Curated annotation (Swiss-Prot):
Superkingdom of the source species: Bacteria
Stored NCBIfam families: gcvT (TIGR00528), PRK00389.1 (NF001567)
EC number of the protein: 2.1.2.10
Designated name of the protein: Aminomethyltransferase
Length: 365
């Protein structure tokens, strides 16, 4: 099993470690609820170095990535990032990813840990059509640290005084020096809170992690495991590969039409998406349940007549709302907020209702 550059720190801090995407990763330290609340109320530090990262370089790099992904990469400029998808020809999802435009001929990609090898092979299998474009896998050399929460920019200002990180627009990034190395600081995240994700060489990861933990001590910063990362993203309704999105899911039936630009030139999966746009059958929705039973992936969902209408994608008890919440893929007729539903949990029908997403921070743009 692979380890990140921060694994020894996590173990020394008493983290409970698990296998995730082939990496030994912290699932929790003090506990999921306490860590979740730290991010919502103060600040949390995440090691997400298990994520894959690639460089795509060459004069035709933009053309190549436009063909491979659904969003319109021509709309962003140097120093900007974009959330996007890679699709199979039938419209199924290869992965969701973020692409960072470093320059006109250099792009940096961050992909899901569990899909890293698959994604690299998928990109490699099409790159031959674009002469002069190179694909490089830097996953084993780079660490990724996320600082998230309302106190994030106060903490960053102590470690990087005068850098102006707080002035970064959403999905923008800058490069900064840190202990003789160049690091990339991006205004991105997976929690719905203010914050950044920082990419840097493995050799500098412990030093930066320690500096941020020390700088955030007075603000109540906490190290955060993958357990709270999941409850935080679920409260926001963000997709997770293998749950809301996967091989046999079309993005237009998963609340991701906004990243599928059917008006741009051809990309893999475009025709399949055009067909689904004409006649979508289902949608990913949020829901909450009465009582305390926790909905889990693949649990069946029923309508008021006890007819099966879909299944659960993700579920948990929301630490913020203190009630069971989840996402489900439902037939379109039952996707409207307020629609009554029932989830079968251990042989019992648990009543609930479709909810508007996100569950928290609905007032934010």
């Amino acid at each position: 099993m692979k380890k990140t550059a921060l694994s020894a720190w996590h173990e020394a801090a008493g983290a409970k470690m698990i296998d995730f995407g082939g990496f030994l990763m912290p699932v929790q330290y003090t506990g999921i609820i306490a860590e979740h609340k730290a991010v919502r109320e103060a600040a949390g530090l995440f090691d997400v170095s298990h994520m894959g990262n690639f460089y795509v370089r060459g004069a035709r790099a933009l053309e190549f990535l436009q063909y491979m992904t659904t969003n319109d990469l021509a709309k962003i400029v140097d120093g900007q990032a974009q959330y996007t998808l890679m699709l199979y020809p039938d419209g199924g999802i290869v992965d969701d990813l973020i692409i960072y435009r470093v320059s006109a001929d250099t792009f940096f990609l961050i992909v899901n840990a569990s899909n890293c090898e698959k994604d690299f092979d998928w990109l490699s299998s099409h790159i031959g059509q674009f002469e002069g474009v190179a694909l490089e896998n830097h996953t084993s050399e780079l660490s990724l640290i996320a600082l998230q929460g309302p106190k994030s920019f106060d903490i960053l200002a102590r470690v990087f005084p005068g850098a102006g990180i707080d002035k970064l627009g959403s999905f923008h990034f800058i490069k900064l020096p840190f202990e003789g190395a160049e690091i990339m600081v991006a205004r991105t995240g997976y929690t719905g809170e203010a914050g950044v994700e920082i990419c840097l060489p493995n050799e500098r990861a412990v030093a930066l992690w320690s500096a941020l933990m020390e700088a955030g001590k007075s603000d109540g910063i906490q190290p955060i495991g993958l357990g709270a990362r999941d409850t935080l993203r679920l409260e926001m309704g963000y997709s997770l590969y293998g749950h809301e999105i996967e091989r046999d899911v079309n993005p237009l039936e998963a609340r991701l039409k906004w990243v599928v630009k059917l008006n741009k030139p051809n990309f893999i999966g475009k025709q399949a998406c055009e067909q689904v746009e004409i006649n979508p059958r289902k949608s990913v929705v949020g829901f909450s349940l009465e009582g305390r039973a926790i909905p889990r992936q693949h649990f069946k969902v029923y309508n008021s007549d006890k007819q099966e209408i879909g299944e659960v994608c993700s579920g948990t008890v929301s630490p913020t709302l203190q009630e069971p919440i989840g996402t489900a893929s439902l037939l379109l007729d039952y996707a409207q907020p307020g629609t009554p539903i029932f989830v079968e949990i251990r042989g019992t029908m648990q009543p609930g209702a479709v909810r508007r997403l996100p569950f928290v921070h609905a007032d934010r743009p």
